[in-house]
Amino acid sequence: MTARPSVSVYSASEDKVVGTCSLPAVFTAPIRHDVVQFVHTNMAKNSRQPYAVNRLSGMKHSTESWGTGRAVARIPRIHGGGTSMSGAGAFGNMCRGGRMFAPTKIFRRWHRKINLHQKRFAVVSALAASSLPALVMSRGHKIENVAEVPLVVEDGVRAYEKTKEAMTFLKTVGAIDDVNRVNDSRQIRAGRGKMRNRRYVARRGPMLVMPDNKGTRAFRNIFGLDLANVNSLNLLHLAPGGHVGRFIIWTKSAFEKLDKIFGTFTEPSTVKSGFMLPAPMLTSTDVTRIMQSEEVRRVLKPKKLQPKRPSRYRQPTNGIRNRRLRLRLNPFQKKEKAMAKGMQNKKNREARHAAKVVRLAKARKNVAKALKKK
């Protein structure tokens, strides 16, 4: 969350700061991606147009089932003879020329109701996310040449009447890179939508927010730049696709109206009845520091020192039954057991016997030599 007390106001014609304004409290609100995604999904459903197939599609045949006993399916079959269609299955979704399975109806539940407070919370979260450069860049916006986020400009941009002046303004504040990104991303849509007046798709660029609907004439024909009124901010524009972090350019007068529209953490909004900014549950996420602070330790009771209980483990005393005690009393027993195990192996026994025979032969030979010398 943003923690700056003030934001710089930039000139519309020159690359310089012309003033400052306090940061609205809405930019320090908690960011809830799950709430934004949920509200966006349900809001997007409210602009759908009902559609359905013809009620009689696939049912315009004179048919009758042949019944059982003919070793064929019991699907209704077309009457008549003398044509390739006679006797062909009809009506079913598995048949040629038949209806679809579960034909679509126009009385489907197309629209969704959303809690008013939930919609306001989602808008607040989207605005708070737009003040973090990391989230704005992760959404794909080109803001490397932008001086500051959130970007606030003077109200002189509302006096522009020519698109040429608007393009010069975008170059001055460094937002032209994001507009060019939108132009470069324009391509033909994949699928049937290209035949239904939705031929092209493109990314979303910056959004210019103004205090009212005046002064939009110079900007409305720039492809890649969206315009919005601060009094009617829409979540579908603040977080396209349900992804927070839209690059927003604010005019100074629109930026200063945010505290009145959304209120603060202590004062309710003067526009939205009964709405106050949702306060974060934790101002510090360092739980260890909180638990070790003097304020918390002063309230908690001192730690009780429990007497040390004797261990339930009893030292073994029977060396015959306990192997560990037996090895501790007689360490040679482990080697002795390994030697006994080696004696049980037939190959080892034969090898030792052969070695013993060789040793005895050498000993007899040495004894014979000693007797000859005498």
Swiss-Prot record:
Region (Disordered), start-end ranges: 336-355
One function term, GO molecular function aspect: structural constituent of ribosome
Pfam annotation, one family: Ribosomal_L4
CC terms in the record's Gene Ontology section: ribonucleoprotein complex; ribosome
InterPro entries per UniProt: Ribos_uL4_C_dom, Ribosomal_uL4, Ribosomal_uL4_dom_sf, Ribosomal_uL4_euk/arc_CS, Ribosomal_uL4_euk/arch
Keywords linked to the UniProt accession: Ribonucleoprotein, Ribosomal protein
GO biological process: translation
Family as reported in the entry's similarity comment: Belongs to the universal ribosomal protein uL4 family.
Name this protein carries in UniProt: Large ribosomal subunit protein uL4
